[in-house]
């Protein structure tokens, strides 16, 4: 009905109707924008912006190896969506769980292509990656490390869902990215998707709206509220107040990048957001990360960026979900923040302190967030988190009970 209203009054070309945030994507001639804005039911018009990619020592820095040794957790049973340029399903580190092609245990259990095949929504599209960025991220989260096993992901026995929203050049429209995000929510029960990694971002393009009003940020928050722990890269702009859409969304876990010496990487974007919200939430190693090199079959390559930090943190979430499948996305965020090693926010390794240095421990700052992710404490706290519920009601009476006594429960 909304589409009919638009097409009958202006020359509107429909792309997609979103259900999670009550929005429609499409195109309209510039000269019809004012007319469009006056149609009944039109609350806001946004420019369809462009999102782009934002470019094993991490396991040692964050204590992931200790998890394998002390608990045996390896991500088994957890599923993470990689919302990116795609995933190379032919790479030996991503083709199956046990690296034995004679067994039926795929690593990638579903794939949706919002760029070139959006009509195929059942998840059965053959996985591919015509850029390479998404495969590198997928390997960081859950690659097995085959054939040499020198560079496995954080959760090597977790499974993946590929959601291609960026093209072969590494960019995509807000509308296309949102289509992939909504598909992920709609299929979360079908494929048991509990976490998602989005190593992409852009800046607020509409001066008269805050980032929270941008549809892609609202969609990100809806993903979290629908049970998916969403990790988003802070960006690589290297300066403060430059965390843009969708990393500026309130409910997501925004990830900054560390060098291997655990200092903030020189490129890692810093908060606050446009609204003054402190971001990022946490920091993870993102420099010189070795992971899958797409379309090589067996190769690995080094990349740096908050793009590389984000899937690493998502891999830790997969370990936490294995330890306790009852966790909510907010449990994941809170535990990761509370167990992080606090870092004072000296900018880019400079000697001068920044204003937040005097704040108490575990208060989030705009450089490191709550600090460096500590995987083992996070997983142990996740495992020990117990939800207690009781239907019992204790009623204390100050008056002796007689045959005529009554208890009123209001």
Please report, for each region that a protein language model flagged, where it lies by residue.
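C-terminal subdomain of the subtilisin-like protease fold in secreted/lumenal serine endopeptidases
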Residues: 193-199, 322-409
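Hydrolase catalytic cores
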Residues: 138-141, 161-167, 196, 242, ...
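Extracellular S/T/G-rich loop segment that most often corresponds to the catalytic His/Ser-adjacent loop
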Residues: 106-117, 244-322, 326, 377
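Autoinhibitory propeptides
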Residues: 3-76, 95-98
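Subtilisin-like serine protease catalytic core
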Residues: 68-112, 118-175, 189-195, 225, ...
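Active-site-proximal beta-strand/loop segments in catalytic clefts of secreted hydrolases
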Residues: 28-29, 47-50, 81-86, 112, ...
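Substrate-binding/access-modulating region of protease and related hydrolase catalytic domains
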Residues: 3, 74-76, 144-148, 165-251, ...
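Acidic, glycine-anchored loop motifs typical of Ca2+
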Residues: 99-104, 187, 399, 405-408
């Amino acid at each position: 009905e909304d589409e009919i209203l638009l097409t009958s009054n202006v020359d509107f070309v429909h792309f997609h109707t979103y259900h999670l945030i009550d929005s429609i994507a499409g195109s309209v001639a510039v000269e019809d924008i004012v007319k469009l804005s006056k149609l009944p039911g039109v609350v806001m018009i946004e420019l369809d912006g462009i999102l782009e990619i934002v470019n094993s020592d991490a396991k040692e820095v964050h204590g992931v190896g200790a998890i394998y040794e002390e608990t045996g957790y390896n991500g088994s049973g957890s599923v993470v969506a990689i919302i990116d340029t795609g995933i190379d399903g032919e790479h030996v580190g991503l083709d199956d769980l046990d690296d034995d092609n004679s067994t039926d245990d795929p690593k990638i259990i579903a794939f949706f292509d919002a760029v070139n095949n959006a009509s195929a929504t059942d998840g059965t599209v053959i996985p591919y990656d015509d850029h390479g960025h998404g495969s590198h991220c997928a390997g960081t989260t859950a690659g097995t490390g085959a054939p040499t096993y020198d560079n496995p992901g954080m959760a090597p026995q977790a499974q993946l869902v590929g959601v291609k929203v960026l093209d072969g050049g590494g960019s995509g429209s807000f509308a296309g990215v949102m289509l992939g995000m909504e598909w992920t929510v709609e299929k979360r029960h079908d494929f048991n998707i509990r976490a998602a990694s989005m190593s992409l971002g852009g800046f607020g393009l509409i001066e008269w709206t805050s980032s929270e009003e941008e549809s892609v940020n609202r969609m990100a928050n809806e993903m979290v509220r629908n049970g998916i722990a969403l990790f988003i890269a802070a960006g690589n702009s290297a300066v403060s107040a430059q965390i843009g859409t969708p990393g500026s969304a309130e409910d997501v876990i925004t990830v900054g990048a560390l060098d291997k010496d655990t200092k903030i990487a020189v490129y890692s974007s810093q908060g606050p957001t446009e609204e003054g919200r402190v971001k990022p939430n946490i920091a993870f190693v993102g420099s010189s990360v070795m992971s899958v090199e797409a379309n090589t079959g067996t190769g690995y390559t080094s990349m740096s960026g908050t793009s590389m930090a984000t899937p690493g943190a998502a891999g830790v979430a997969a370990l936490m979900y294995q330890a306790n499948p009852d966790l909510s996305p907010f449990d994941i965020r809170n535990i990761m923040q509370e167990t992080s090693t606090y870092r004072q926010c000296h900018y880019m390794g400079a000697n001068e302190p920044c204003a937040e240095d005097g704040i108490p421990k575990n208060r989030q700052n705009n450089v490191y967030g709550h600090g460096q992710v500590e995987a083992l404490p996070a997983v142990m706290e996740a495992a020990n988190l117990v939800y207690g519920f009781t239907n019992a009601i204790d009623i204390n009476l100050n008056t002796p009970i007689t045959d005529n006594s009554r208890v009123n429960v209001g």
